[in-house]
C-alpha cells in the first residue's frame, strides 16, 4: 500500500526507517528515549536536511513507521510517512541528498509502533478525545493508506472525527463507506521535535507538550504563570480596545464568533490586573476596553441598560458589564451606563428570588441550564455593590435569591453553578458572618471536589482538571480550561473561609484541590519553547491557555478566569503570610506553594 500525501522524497524517511525499524517480534520501544538516542536523531535529521551522509544512529527497537514533517517559522512546508519497504532504493536516494526541508527551522518526528485494528463499533471508546495527541490513526482503503500521527493531530488541532472525515475525502469515499469498507487501526508513537536552527536539539514530548509534575506548582512558578497570562491578555488587546475572543495558534487567525459574557469578564480581568499592579497604563487599557465594548454593544431602552449581541440580551452579560465598570477606579466616567445596567438586573429579578435570564428573546429564559450561570454572576455584582454601600432592599433581594437558588441547585446539581455563588456569598459572609452563607459555601464546594477525584483519565497530563467521566455526569459537560479557572476562583474563597473558621480538614482538602487545579492549568499554558513548533505567530500564542491538553485553541476566558483566580490566590497568600509572620503563627495556615 502507498501512503497518501507524501510531500517529501521517500529517501528522507526510508533511511530513518532502515535504522529504526527492527526485526519483527521485538518488544515495544522505551517510553522515554535516552539522551544518546535523542542526540542521534537530531544529528540524523540535520544530515538529511543538508543532504549529508548519515551518522551512525542509535537503535530504537520496535518502530514500525516514521512520520517526518518540516516546519519553517511555525508553518509546515513538507511531510511524509514511510514504512520499511524499498529500503535499498531509499538509501540510494538519501545518499544523493534530500531536496526537502532546506528552509526548515524545526522538524517533527513521530516514531510509530503498536499498530492494532479498530472496531468501527467501538470507535467512541478507542478514539475518545482523551487519546487525541497520544494515539495516531491509520485508514486503509483500495490499496491506499492515510495516517495521522499523534503530534500531527496536535499541531493541526485535529480531532479524530475530523481526521476520519479528512481521510475519507483523500480516499474519495464518504464517511459511511469508510466505516464499512476501510481498515482502521490505531497506534502509539514516540514524539520528538528537533530544533534545527543551530546545533540540532531533539526534545521528546508527550502529546506535543511536557507533562508537569506536582512539584512544578511552586510560588515562583505560579507567579510566572500569572505574568505570562497577563502578557497574553495585554498582547491580545487591540489598539481600538477590542479584546481577542478566540484564537487559533495553528493558523494564526481569530474566530469571527463572540460572546458578551466572556468579553465583559475579560474587561473585569483587565481592571483587576491594573488595580493589582498599580499600573496606570494597564488601567487605561482596561478603560479603553470598557469604552469599546460600550460603544459596540450597549444601548438604553426605557431606562434599562442593554448589552446586545446578535439580538440576544443576557442577564449575565448585563451584570458582568456593570461589575467591570464598578471595579474600575474611573467608574464615574461610566456612571450613567452603570446605573442603567443595574436597573436591568433589578428589572429581571422576580419576587420568589429567581431571575429572568434573557431579556431578549425572553423565551430563552425557559432554558433551566442558564440558571447555573447568570443569576450567580448577578449576585456577585450585587454582593460587590453591597460591600461598598449598604442597601437594605437589595440585601433582602440578595438573600431571597440565595435561598431560592440553594433549593434550586440541590434539585439539579451542576458544578458550573458553584463558583459564581461561592464568590458572591463569600463577599457577603465577610461582612455579615452569616452561618447560612458559610454552611452553603462549604456544602457546594465539598461536592465540587468530587469532580476532580477521577481527573486522571488514562494519562498524567489530565490530572487536576474538574471533569468526571462517569456516564451519570456526562451532562455536566466536557473538560475545559475556563471551567478549571472559574472553579479556582471560587475555591480560593472557600479555602479562605475554611481558614477563617479554623476548619483545618476542609482547608487541607480545598488547598490540595487548588494545587491540583493549578497544575492542570499550568499544563495548558503555551510557552515560547519547542512545544510551539507549529505556531507561526508565537507572540500571540505565548502565555495563553489551551482549551484542553488535546485542543490548542485559546479562548479569552481560558486565560481570564485562571488569571483572576491566581491573582486572588497570590494576593491572599501574600497578605496572609505577612499576618502570620507578624503574629508568629504557624505557616501551616498558608497555601504552601514552595
PLM regions and their residue ranges:
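Bacterial N-terminal signal peptides
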Residues: 10-22
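Basic nucleic-acid-binding interfaces
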Residues: 27-199
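Low-complexity, Ser/Thr/Pro/Gly-enriched N-terminal "stalk/linker" regions
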Residues: 198-261, 280, 285-288, 292, ...
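Well-ordered alpha-helical scaffold segments within catalytic/enzyme domains
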Residues: 208-219, 264-280, 319-333, 377-391, ...
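Extended, well-ordered alpha-helical scaffold segments
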Residues: 218-233, 278-296, 330-348, 389-408, ...
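Carbohydrate-binding/catalytic loop surfaces
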Residues: 243-259, 302-323, 355-377, 419-434, ...
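CBM-like carbohydrate-recognition segments
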Residues: 258, 452-490, 494-594
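Solenoidal tandem-repeat scaffolds enriched in leucines and small polar residues
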Residues: 344-403, 407
Amino acid at each position: 500500500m502507498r501512503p497518501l500525501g507524501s510531500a517529501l522524497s521517500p529517501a528522507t524517511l526510508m533511511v530513518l526507517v532502515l535504522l529504526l525499524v527492527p526485526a519483527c517480534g521485538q518488544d515495544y520501544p522505551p517510553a522515554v528515549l535516552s539522551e544518546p538516542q535523542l542526540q542521534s536523531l537530531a544529528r540524523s535529521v540535520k544530515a538529511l536536511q543538508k543532504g549529508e551522509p548519515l551518522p551512525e544512529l542509535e537503535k530504537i527497537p520496535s518502530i514500525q513507521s516514521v512520520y517526518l514533517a518540516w516546519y519553517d517559522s511555525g508553518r509546515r512546508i513538507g511531510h511524509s510517512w514511510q514504512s520499511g519497504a524499498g529500503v535499498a532504493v531509499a538509501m540510494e536516494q538519501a545518499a544523493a541528498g534530500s531536496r526537502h526541508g532546506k528552509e526548515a527551522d524545526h522538524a517533527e518526528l513521530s516514531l510509530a509502533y503498536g499498530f492494532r485494528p479498530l472496531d468501527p463499533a467501538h470507535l467512541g471508546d478507542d478514539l475518545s478525545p482523551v487519546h487525541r495527541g497520544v494515539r495516531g490513526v491509520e485508514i486503509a482503503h483500495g490499496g491506499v493508506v492515510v495516517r495521522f500521527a499523534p503530534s500531527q493531530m496536535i499541531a493541526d488541532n485535529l480531532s479524530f472525527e475530523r481526521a476520519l472525515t479528512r481521510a475519507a475525502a483523500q480516499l474519495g469515499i464518504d464517511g459511511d463507506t469508510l466505516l464499512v469498507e476501510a481498515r482502521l487501526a490505531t497506534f502509539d508513537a514516540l514524539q520528538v521535535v528537533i530544533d534545527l536552527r543551530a546545533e540540532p536539539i531533539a526534545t521528546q514530548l508527550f502529546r506535543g507538550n511536557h507533562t508537569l509534575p506536582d512539584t512544578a506548582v511552586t510560588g515562583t512558578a505560579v507567579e510566572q504563570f500569572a505574568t505570562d497570562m497577563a502578557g497574553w491578555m495585554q498582547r491580545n488587546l487591540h489598539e481600538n480596545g477590542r479584546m481577542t475572543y478566540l484564537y487559533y495558534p495553528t493558523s494564526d487567525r481569530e474566530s469571527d464568533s463572540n460572546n458578551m459574557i466572556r468579553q465583559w469578564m475579560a474587561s473585569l480581568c483587565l481592571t483587576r490586573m491594573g488595580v493589582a499592579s498599580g499600573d496606570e497604563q494597564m488601567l487605561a487599557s482596561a478603560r479603553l476596553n470598557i469604552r469599546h465594548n460600550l460603544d459596540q454593544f450597549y444601548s438604553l431602552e426605557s431606562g434599562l441598560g442593554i448589552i446586545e449581541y446578535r439580538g440576544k440580551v443576557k442577564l449575565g452579560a448585563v451584570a458582568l458589564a456593570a461589575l467591570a465598570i464598578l471595579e474600575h477606579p474611573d467608574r464615574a466616567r461610566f456612571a450613567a451606563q452603570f446605573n442603567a445596567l443595574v436597573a436591568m438586573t433589578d428589572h429581571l429579578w422576580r419576587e420568589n428570588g429567581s431571575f429572568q435570564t434573557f431579556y431578549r428573546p425572553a423565551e430563552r429564559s425557559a432554558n433551566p441550564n442558564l440558571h447555573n450561570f447568570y443569576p450567580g454572576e448577578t449576585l456577585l455584582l450585587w454582593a460587590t455593590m453591597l460591600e461598598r454601600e449598604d442597601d437594605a432592599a437589595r440585601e433582602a433581594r440578595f438573600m431571597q435569591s440565595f435561598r431560592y437558588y440553594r433549593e434550586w441547585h440541590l434539585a439539579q446539581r451542576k458544578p458550573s453553578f458553584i463558583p459564581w455563588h461561592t464568590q458572591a456569598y463569600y463577599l457577603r459572609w465577610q461582612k455579615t458572618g452569616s452561618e447560612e452563607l458559610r454552611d452553603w459555601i462549604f456544602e457546594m464546594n465539598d461536592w465540587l471536589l468530587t469532580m476532580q477525584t477521577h481527573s486522571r483519565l488514562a494519562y498524567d497530563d489530565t490530572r487536576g482538571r474538574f471533569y468526571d467521566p462517569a456516564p451519570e455526569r456526562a451532562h455536566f459537560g466536557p473538560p475545559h480550561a475556563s471551567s478549571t479557572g472559574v472553579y479556582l476562583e471560587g475555591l480560593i474563597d472557600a479555602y479562605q473561609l475554611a481558614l477563617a473558621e479554623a476548619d483545618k480538614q476542609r482547608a487541607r482538602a480545598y488547598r490540595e484541590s487548588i494545587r491540583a487545579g493549578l497544575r492542570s492549568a499550568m499544563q495548558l499554558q503555551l510557552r515560547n519553547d519547542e512545544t510551539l513548533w507549529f505556531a507561526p505567530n508565537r507572540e500571540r500564542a505565548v502565555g495563553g491557555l489551551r482549551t484542553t491538553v488535546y485542543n490548542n485553541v485559546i479562548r479569552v476566558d481560558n486565560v481570564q478566569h485562571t488569571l483572576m483566580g491566581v491573582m486572588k490566590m497570590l494576593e491572599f497568600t501574600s497578605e496572609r503570610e505577612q499576618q502570620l509572620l507578624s503574629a508568629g503563627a504557624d505557616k501551616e495556615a498558608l497555601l504552601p506553594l514552595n
